[in-house]
């Protein structure tokens, strides 16, 4: 079956939604701060966007929904999974997904809240909703999302993953669990995986840290040492003058200069390892 794309606004009602999803996820207007910080419109001629549903056996509900964005053209394209923070698929992450597609990647942003109604329209409620879910099943949903994207008809079979905060930690652990099925990962200020699991990583990693992020950075040296001892292909960057969340241009923690550098490095890294 060939995938068809229909450009739809972020969080718009669409025919791709499950019938039992709540009205909370049906808002078709961006929150003011998100509208002001959007960098790539869903109507941009360089991309095509749609929401997709796919199976997720063993996950929260057995089904998942994600925001799939393809570059213009027929493909196949290298694939990049974009994993949100701990508050669901908000407009910031949807914009990041469109940014990746503009660079030539088939990009998918799963919404971990989709089994219970989807992103509710504000980050505060989204955070409460995500906290209520089983973390093990959430991770299974991300594993299934990665496999869905890698095997998509428009994918070239090469898989990368990037994520932010909670999503950064997921990227690190996807590298452990997927092994050779994941080619590259770029976690932003995410929790490191267990040291004993590092040997399982086969993906190339670019690990991005904020300078002022004590909780996440507490494991950095241990993570670096384990990667070196296991002879993994990786690079780590720390961005001067930044705090946790510095890439998110919809919050006060945004650091425009360093976010630009980090994103350019991310795209270059994926182009190198996923082509």
Task: Pin down the residues of each PLM region.
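Primarily recognizes the serine-hydrolase "nucleophile elbow" in alpha/beta-hydrolase
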Residues: 143-202
């Amino acid at each position: 079956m060939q995938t068809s794309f229909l450009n739809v606004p972020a969080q718009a009602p669409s025919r791709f939604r499950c019938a039992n999803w709540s009205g909370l996820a049906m808002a078709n207007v961006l929150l003011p701060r998100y509208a002001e910080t959007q960098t790539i419109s869903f109507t941009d001629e360089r991309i095509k966007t749609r929401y997709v549903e796919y199976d997720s056996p063993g996950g929260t509900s057995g089904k998942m929904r994600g925001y799939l964005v393809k570059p213009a053209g027929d493909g196949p394209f290298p694939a990049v999974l974009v994993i949100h923070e701990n508050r669901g698929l908000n407009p910031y992450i949807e914009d990041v997904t469109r940014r990746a597609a503009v660079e030539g990647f088939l990009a998918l942003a799963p919404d971990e809240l989709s089994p219970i109604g989807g992103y509710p329209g504000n980050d505060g409620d989204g955070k409460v909703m995500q906290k209520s879910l089983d973390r093990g099943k959430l991770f299974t949903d991300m594993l299934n999302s990665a496999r869905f994207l890698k095997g998509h008809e428009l994918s070239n079979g090469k898989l990368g993953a990037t994520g932010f905060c909670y999503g950064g930690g997921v990227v690190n652990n996807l590298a452990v669990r997927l092994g050779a099925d994941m080619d590259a990962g770029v976690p932003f200020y995410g929790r490191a995986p267990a040291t004993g699991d590092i040997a399982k990583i086969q993906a190339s990693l670019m690990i991005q840290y904020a300078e002022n992020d004590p909780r996440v950075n507490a494991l950095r040296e241990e993570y670096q040492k384990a990667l070196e001892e296991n002879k993994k292909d990786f690079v780590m960057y720390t961005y001067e003058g930044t705090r946790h969340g510095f890439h998110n241009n919809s919050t006060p923690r945004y650091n425009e200069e360093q976010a630009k550098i980090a994103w350019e490095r991310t795209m270059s890294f994926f182009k190198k390892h996923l082509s």
